[in-house]
Every structure is written in C-alpha cells, then in structure tokens.
Amino acid sequence: EETGKAAGYISTVTGNAEEGFIITNTITSVKISKVDITDQKELAGAHIQVIDKDGNVVEEWDSTWEAHEVTGLKPGETYTLRETVAPEGYTLTSDTTFTLKEDGTVNKDTTTTTISDNGTLLVEDSRTSVKVSKVDISDGKELEGAHIQIIDQDGNVVDEWDSTKEAHITEKLKTGKIYTLRETVAPDGYLLTSDTTFVLKEDGTVDAEKTTAVSKDGVLLVQDKLATTASIAVTKKLTYIGENLAARDQTFYVALYSDKECTQRVSDVKALVFK
C-alpha cells in the first residue's frame, strides 16, 4: 500500500491481488530547447529559468546546442519558463507557463509554452530586426543611390548596402550596443549627411533615449539635403616682408569640405587663376 505520492515522481502499479502489486516511482523528466523561432534550430548563449508557483527558481542553465533536461518537477503544478539573457542578435522572449500531467507528459491544455512533436518545450526567440530608410529630409521620400553602412563599437562594418526605393532590413544586431549609421556616398544632387548612432533595447525596438538617429514608427531615417548651387571667391596671396609676390609658375587648387578633418568634399576641385 502506498499512502502518498513522492513529489516529482510518477507512480505506476503493476501486478494483481493474487501475486501482489508492484508500485514503481519514476522521476519526472521534461526537455527544454532554446530555438530560433524562424528555423527551430538550437541556440546557445541564453539563460533560462524554471520558476515554481511560489516564485522560486527550481532550475536554471545557459543554453547550448542541445536540449536541457529538467527532472523532479511536480505533476499538476504550474511552472514558468523565463529567459533572462537572450543570445546575441536575438530579443528576449516573454514568459510562458507549463504543467505536467500525472503521467509526466506535458499538459497541452494548461500550457502556453510551444511544444514540439516529441514533447520538448520550446523557448523561441526572434532575431533582432531594424529597418533603415534613406530619405529626403524635406518630404521624407525614399532615395536610391546612397551607400549606407552600419558600424559596431569596434569600428567593424556589420552591414552595408546601396539604398533603393524601399527600406533596408538589418537582422541580428546586438541589443544594448551602440551602432553608427554612416553614409559614404550620397544620391546624385544631395549632400552627405553626418553620422548618427542608435541602440536596440532587449525587446529589439529602438531605444529612443540612446539614439541620435531620427526614428519614425520604429524605422531609422538617414536624411539627406539637396545640394544647392553657390559660388565663392578664393584669393591666394604670397607675401614677403609685406609685399605681394607674383607666382605665375605655380598652380594652387581649392575645394570645400563639410568637416574639419577634410574627408567629406562637397565641391569640385578648382585651380586658382592668377589675375
């Protein structure tokens, strides 16, 4: 006779009254996988917790390329699956809950966690995704023909493209890191814009408080101004002891730059003509 069940075990009874009964207690076991929501491939680098109804963490681990096995959970009790750290390039997923039936299998009727065909619980993460649009600053229309780069904190170009009439989508950027948006080639008739920066929050959205790039409806905007035509007179003088010298055998060239480092030229190179 068994008067009570051991917590975290499944009890099975075999035999008969004539020969006797055998009660076998088997510890409960459930597998949990951390996967990409798109292709269901295992993801390493997440920190996962299993939390009981009283808020106690009964199991936690860092995900690897294989499913994690949790044993000794109580049938009939509701547990919470929580991700506290997402893999790089992914967003934190929301909490889900699950319950085991008396036979140790997952109760699909009381479980919000995704369950695979083999009964494994899936903690699904989405890749970070951000849209970048190249637009005219005056009317917000998309501009094609610009070359845009996204640069990480170490100066590495993690994505680059030539703008089209549609926004560009960049995936798997790290949350909480500062990225630089840089335009290296402007569309014909437009001026190069200055660098801006942006940061993604843990849920994958743009962190407005830490972002200098203009953002509209979650889309980062690289805004260009139309180049305007103007002329400027440049005079080159050579003097010696207060006297102007003629230097007809020398040619000097001038150009205008938009930055003090003189890396962003905004005019043609012109030769000075002596008059």
Model-identified regions with their sequence ranges:
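Solvent-exposed loop/turn and edge beta-strand elements of beta-rich ligand-binding domains
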Residues: E1-K275
